[in-house]
Curated annotation (Swiss-Prot):
Full protein name: Nucleoside diphosphate kinase
Enzyme nomenclature, EC number: 2.7.4.6
Compartment(s) where it occurs, according to its Swiss-Prot or TrEMBL record: Cytoplasm
Function according to Swiss-Prot or TrEMBL: Major role in the synthesis of nucleoside triphosphates other than ATP. The ATP gamma phosphate is transferred to the NDP beta phosphate via a ping-pong mechanism, using a phosphorylated active-site intermediate.
GO molecular function, one term: ATP binding
Keywords assigned: ATP-binding, Cytoplasm, Kinase, Magnesium, Metal-binding, Nucleotide metabolism, Nucleotide-binding, Phosphoprotein, Transferase
Keyword DNA-binding: no
Encoding gene (name): ndk
Record carries keyword Heme: no
Superkingdom as given in the UniProt entry: Archaea
Length: 154
């Protein structure tokens, strides 16, 4: 049986102001993932810089930080078996020009700088990003989906 993972997902300002929050959540939930924490907030610069630390030396870093702090974001933790890989498949390639139709970015994004959603790229990144955004004293909701027995083999 595959291990249940937690994945960090953030709907970026372009996704929020374009009214895509419900669409992103719908796709995650219809796949069978559980949302165990969710919040709308305005990222401060310090949090954004920690979140995107790996890009600090890249030429687009400053524009990225300005962008993700420019408007509201929706941050969430989703849970499920192989959640990181499943979410990455749902949202599509980072560059919307390479994202397959049917993915969030393939359907709703045109520019790599405005690609609707961020998700961690590994279980380790997910743990790190969850702690950065939600803090160490994270409180999540534990519940069972009514269709869980139909989603997974034992």
């Amino acid at each position: 049986m595959a291990e249940v993972q937690r994945e960090f997902v953030m709907i970026k300002p372009d996704g929020v102001v374009r009214g895509l929050v419900g669409e992103v959540i719908r796709r995650l939930e219809r796949k069978g993932l559980k949302i165990v924490a969710l919040e709308m907030r305005q990222l401060d610069r310090e949090t954004a810089e920690k979140l995107y630390e790996e890009h600090r030396d890249k030429p687009f870093f400053e524009d990225l930080i300005e962008y993700v702090t420019s408007g509201p974001v929706v941050v969430m933790i989703v849970e499920g078996r192989k959640a990181v890989k499943v979410v990455r498949n749902i949202i599509g390639a980072t560059d919307p020009a390479e994202a397959a139709p049917g993915t969030v970015r393939g359907d709703f994004a045109l520019d790599i700088g405005r690609n609707v959603v961020h998700a961690s790229d590994s279980p380790e990144s997910a743990e790190r990003e969850i702690e950065i955004v939600f803090g160490k004293d994270l409180s999540t909701i534990d519940y069972e989906r009514c269709d869980e027995e139909w989603l997974y083999e034992s």
